[in-house]
Amino acid sequence: MNTWIQLTLSTVLAVVLLSFMVWFIRVRPRQPQLEAVWNSDCELITTADIDDTKITFRNVRDFFWRTTKDRDESWIDEVTVDTEEIKDIWFIVDHFHSLHGLAHTYLTFEFNDGTCLSFSFEARRRVKHRYHPWDGLWRNYELYLLVALESDMTGLRTNARGNKDYMFRGITPPEKDKHMLIRMAQKANQLSEKPEWYHSLLTTCNTSIVRMVNRVTPGRVPFLWRNFLPGYTPRAALKLGLIEDWGGLETTLEKARIDLIAQQWNGEGSYSEMLRRHLPSSTVEKEQ
């Protein structure tokens, strides 16, 4: 073995050992917190009261975003929905980076009365802290389940940030949509009492959704590399029958794109209704 190879192996070994030391000495002892000076967009934690088919969510975000810095901040004290009135579950893929695989995913529950509630697993950030994937590997962010009106959560991405966004109608077996919403409510309550760490690979927006889906329907989403690169999830979701097929992958992507439509919106009427006017009607008949 020549000297250069020996030096390279020694350097790699030293870096690995140093990383383990930092993890066990500095990172592992850290405990997730509920109390801190949080950024205003993740300041409050949502909790839920479950009463038969009715679920009341408390502290639902309802910001109006003109830009990422210019916004009207508001939190709704209570939003009550009925699991029997779920119309659709939507899967949103938000491409926030030039690298296609780097994206944010979340779910929106649409109800028959027009209410659209979005659920997003995110990194909870302290004041003056910005998100970075590297920091997320080292227990720098708590896991945060943001519950917000669709006009807030999706409007932020399509209009204020100008990201490329896709919105797919989910396919759920009978009763599973109700169970999924209940799971979301239960998870919100769990995080309000016992905080958890966010992790840039293992506990992200998409892996958290996958985990929730598989708890409702065990084995529904297999272990896939795309789970860790959410930008590539539409292909897998279509193949697995998790989202509606609107004419093959490319056509489905074309029809599901919402950012260009949203950016032409004049602000009149309902943001959610505006989006759905441009999305295909359901191609799957729901079983009762």
Report each predicted region and the residues it spans:
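N-terminal Sec-pathway targeting helices
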Residues: 1-18
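Activation targets extended, charge/polar-rich intrinsically disordered C-terminal tails
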Residues: 7-8, 185-288
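Membrane-interface motif at the C-terminal end of an N-terminal transmembrane signal
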Residues: 17-34
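Alpha-helical transmembrane signal-anchor/signal-peptide segments
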Residues: 30-47
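N-terminal accessory segments that position/regulate proteins before the catalytic core
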Residues: 42, 48-54, 59
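A short, structured loop/turn motif at beta-sheet edges
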Residues: 50-54, 110-114, 172-177
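Glycine-rich catalytic cores of cysteine/serine-nucleophile enzymes that process amide/ester linkages
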Residues: 55, 60, 65-165
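A structural motif
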Residues: 148-188
